[in-house]
Amino acid sequence: MAAPAAAAVEEGMEPRALQYEQTLMYGRYTQDLGAFAKEEAARIRLGGPEPWRSPPSPRTPPELLEYGQSRCARCRMCSVRCHKFLVSRVGEDWIFLVLLGLLMALVSWAMDYAIAACLQAQQWMSRGLNTNLLLQYLAWVTYPVVLITFSAGFTQILAPQAVGSGIPEMKTILRGVVLKEYLTLKTFVAKVIGLTCALGSGMPLGKEGPFVHIASMCAALLSKFLSLFGGIYENESRNTEMLAAACAVGVGCCFAAPIGGVLFSIEVTSTFFAVRNYWRGFFAATFSAFIFRVLAVWNRDEETITALFKTRFRLDFPFDLQELPAFAVIGIASGFGGALFVYLNRKIVQVMRKQKTINRFLMRKRLLFPALVTLLISTLTFPPGFGQFMAGQLSQKETLVTLFDNRTWVRQGLVEELEPPSTSQAWSPPRANVFLTLVIFILMKFWMSALATTIPVPCGAFMPVFVIGAAFGRLVGESMAAWFPDGIHTDSSTYRIVPGGYAVVGAAALAGAVTHTVSTAVIVFELTGQIAHILPVMIAVILANAVAQSLQPSLYDSIIRIKKLPYLPELGWGRHQQYRVRVEDIMVRDVPHVALSCTFRDLRLALHRTKGRTLALVESPESMILLGSIERTQVVALLAAQLSPARRRQSKQKRRVAHTSPPSCQESPPSPETSVCFQVKAEDAQGEPHKPLKPALKRGCSNSVNLGESPTGHVESAGIALRSLFCGSPPPEAASESEKSESSEKRKSKRVRISLASDSDLEGEMSPEEILEWEEQQLDEPVNFSDCKIDPAPFQLVERTSLHKTHTIFSLLGVDHAYVTSIGRLIGIVTLKELRKAIEGSVTAQGVKVRPPLASFRDSATSSSDTETTEVHALWGPRSRHGLPREGSPSDSDDKCQ
């Protein structure tokens, strides 16, 4: 019993990985371990070996590699020496961050090159077929449909975890949640190729969110590679610090904005950030952005290192004081627009999930939904068609370049003569003006982007929202230029309106409203290369965040809820009632616990009562003094070891030795560990296996041999082994009749094959009734916790702790549950689910509304079934009866109330 318990300790210390479940759009994560439970139940029933019994293969220390004679050993020893030299001269962190920045810069530049080639190919096909409108439409529509379909299919086949942005998942990973196969090599390949095809199709999709995921995968893979040489990267906790730096690198190399990238990654992935990781993010992001722009110069895309969207606003007086109300209006309107975008995106997913018939049909045809969405958007953006009224022929980069133009498009309602006319004229079609084109562009791109981001391909939403905000700001700027055609007059001079500055303000405001970040202002400054409009940008971004945060969660928090990831909502601001809510108002008082002097029956009942990951260990049910906590896996291992088939066979063997005394057994009674049983099979003389009649298979003692006996001798122990092997054998009369029916020729042509009988074949020694009786006896024995690793100091709170302080502690420490004690006595428990639902339901129009104690640790249905033969099987049974814990996963009702 000590070995499984000790092994279960090691297993229990590892966090549970959330499984990814494919859905039509985003997918969801769940901690449902039904498959593992079924495998474990089958193993226990068959008496198979425990998976944790296999000893880990020891790794050769680096000091002993020089004694190896193979070529691989010498190469590895050389690499270890080079690694030690670099570490001693430079440092491990610097090497890691330089490699991470270099790899991400190369990946970003290569992807941008491939995306630009795909977009140019689409424009080339469209221009080449302009003489035939039907062929031009087919080419315009078919090209993105093929790319999106390939991206969706490739991602679903290789790694479904690569779907979507990646920032919501990284936010939960940095909090301590383990997502299965989310940072693997195949997910990296699927993300890179799928994102390249998705952005190359021309759909309104973004790159920033997926690049955070790509950078995190690079950091994880690089950590595994460097851990081969030893050092700090063998420590799993060290990887979290590098993942935080990788998130900054992902944004930095995407927009060549290292400062904004670091700040943005901190805002969207962390509630509390360790300042010791600050320099890592800045160094890696700066190096990555530098290499990214150097590669653009090397490829002759740029003449020198410059901003990604260079602007030329006047620096002496970029704006006047009288324009600040207009900038404030942009911020407030962007706040409402950002909240509406998040609501529309979540509503699309909810509507599709509620339509069960359509959802089931599209789930069977997984590529149909992305193809239909792409077909719809491509049809509406067809340049000779409706796309001419919304600048459909421009890509996102060309759209931003024209929107940030510092020249005025409209003066007194007339379109100015613009140079170059290739891109700017897209905003002034023959039968419309600039205002109508901008309004149609904003409205159409708004719902198109909300719909396109639900496609199951690697994609983000930052860049589409950024473009929509720039268009809205440009609309306000052009309106201001039309209202003040001669500019704004002051005492001494006149200042002309610059619509491009309004576009910069609108882009930062709407992006900040959707993501609930202020760092978008810094990203805009680095993208444009000018900081002239810092005051209007900051005013608009702060106002937009104030409005959006009071209406809707951020886009990333909304996706976290859609995907059923563990999360802890923010308390928000201005809710002073939450300071008066105490832990005693929201805690669960019926805490599942085990006493120090409990029996195995009490352990079984405690496991059936709760799905929690840990159980409280108290001194006695009367005193309820908290001694510590024990992992659920350890309790399961204790119960499984107590009711294991090996113990059952050992008990049966001892009982047989005590009640039966054959001569051979008296001299040397066999033990369960050393007894060897044989199984006899009949084969033809030619070597082909023979299939005798069914009664012949079940002859008890005629074909059994034992060590030290002749093949014809009869030994009682061998007979017992074969009777257990062939349980339910027919009467001896039926066996004798079947023997007489065999011909003598077949008997002569047979030979005997002797093989070892497995332990699982010996379970037939005891009938189901005897097994149940034996288990009832074992369940009444006391539990010995000396072989279990007990946490003597689990996290505890007092009942007077406020809800605000509890939220801060949970966010800062990353804990998922805390016991509530009073002078050492256990009186309740608060989990992540209770805290989340208390925060979401704590404020009403009348004041504080305290939710009743929630049911995450209440009794689950424990109806017994007559078909169960063992108590261990009942423990690991179907999840509807005694499911394994889904700690931290929101309930199904959360998805309905989004």
Curated annotation (Swiss-Prot):
Locate the site labelled Couples extracellular acidification to the channel closure: H533
Keywords on record: CBS domain, Cell membrane, Cell projection, Chloride, Chloride channel, Ion channel, Ion transport, Membrane, Phosphoprotein, Postsynaptic cell membrane, Repeat, Synapse, Transmembrane, Transmembrane helix, Transport, Voltage-gated channel
| Site label Protopore gate, positions | E208
Molecular-function annotations in GO: chloride channel regulator activity; voltage-gated chloride channel activity
Is this entry keyworded Iron?
no
One Pfam assignment: Voltage_CLC
Q: In which tissues is it expressed?
A: Ubiquitously expressed.
Q: What is its main location?
A: membrane
Q: How is it modified after translation?
A: Phosphorylated. Activated by dephosphorylation.
* Cystine bridges: none
Q: Which SUPFAM superfamilies match?
A: CBS-domain pair (SSF54631), Clc chloride channel (SSF81340)
Cite the residue spans of the region called Essential for channel gating by both voltage and cell volume: 19-37
Activity regulation info: Common gate kinetics are down-regulated by intracellular ATP. Inhibited by AK-42, a derivative of meclofenamate. Inhibited by Cd(2+). Inhibited by Zn(2+) and PKC activation. Inhibited at acidic pH. CCLN2:HEPACAM channel conductance is up-regulated upon hypo-osmolarity.
What PROSITE patterns has UniProt attached to this entry? CBS (PS51371)
Instruction: Relate the protein's function as given in its record.
Output: Voltage-gated and osmosensitive chloride channel. Forms a homodimeric channel where each subunit has its own ion conduction pathway. Conducts double-barreled currents controlled by two types of gates, two fast glutamate gates that control each subunit independently and a slow common gate that opens and shuts off both subunits simultaneously. Displays inward rectification currents activated upon membrane hyperpolarization and extracellular hypotonicity. Contributes to chloride conductance involved in neuron excitability.
This one is known as Chloride channel protein 2
